[in-house]
């Protein structure tokens, strides 16, 4: 992916799909009114993206409207404990923490450099006491975290955001459900993938598409949750996420 910058937000341009300029024009217009530079969290969020780029991280964070949507979801649910699988530079976790002053977030990141940058960004934003970054493979760390939930060392989560390798997406989702409280929400990012989710060539040859389909199909059979996939046309081009609510 390549990226360009506008006055209000970071624009993600996909090489796999032709964007309509109205998509990001609408985001720029709405963000200028609903998330203007005068907001208290604007400077720290901008600094997070800036430092992440400066330190060489990929420009693949959740786009600003999606990150704020998740922060508002946590507000709606009165969430006190959240889980994130895939920290990158900490942008989403910082956004959520900035709008939820009582929330505590556990975030898992496999890449040591990304985790280091995320910790820098989190400290710069002043949330180091509320966002914990665990470094390692989620498939290894989630069972340890689940054990802590079951023995009472860790509170159950009211919100989970999964934005990591898609081939293990279902496994991450399964662990998230096991660690969630009733009526918790779980979001799995990047499942639509510019429509590749239903394109035969990608179904056969793309491990990310196969992983996303496995997640969607298994969630559909899972009596513990109810779920929907929402397609998005926005700054990050054409994609979508799965959102589930734990019964």
Curated annotation (Swiss-Prot):
* Record's note on what induces expression: Expression is down-regulated by ralstonins, lipopeptides produced by the plant pathogenic bacteria Ralstonia solanacearum. Expression is positively regulated by the imizoquins cluster-specific transcription regulator imqK.
What does the Swiss-Prot or TrEMBL cofactor note state?
Binds 1 divalent metal cation per subunit.
Q: Which UniProt keywords apply?
A: Metal-binding, Methyltransferase, S-adenosyl-L-methionine, Transferase
Q: Name one GO biological process term.
A: methylation
Its needed co-factors are: a divalent metal cation
User: Which EC number(s) are documented for this chain?
Assistant: 2.1.1.-
UniProt-listed Gene3D superfamilies: Vaccinia Virus protein VP39 (3.40.50.150)
The residues the entry assigns to the signal sequence are none
CDD domains xref list: AdoMet_MTases
How does this chain assemble? Homodimer.
Q: What name is this protein filed under?
A: O-methyltransferase imqG
Q: What organism is recorded for this protein?
A: Aspergillus flavus (strain ATCC 200026 / FGSC A1120 / IAM 13836 / NRRL 3357 / JCM 12722 / SRRC 167)
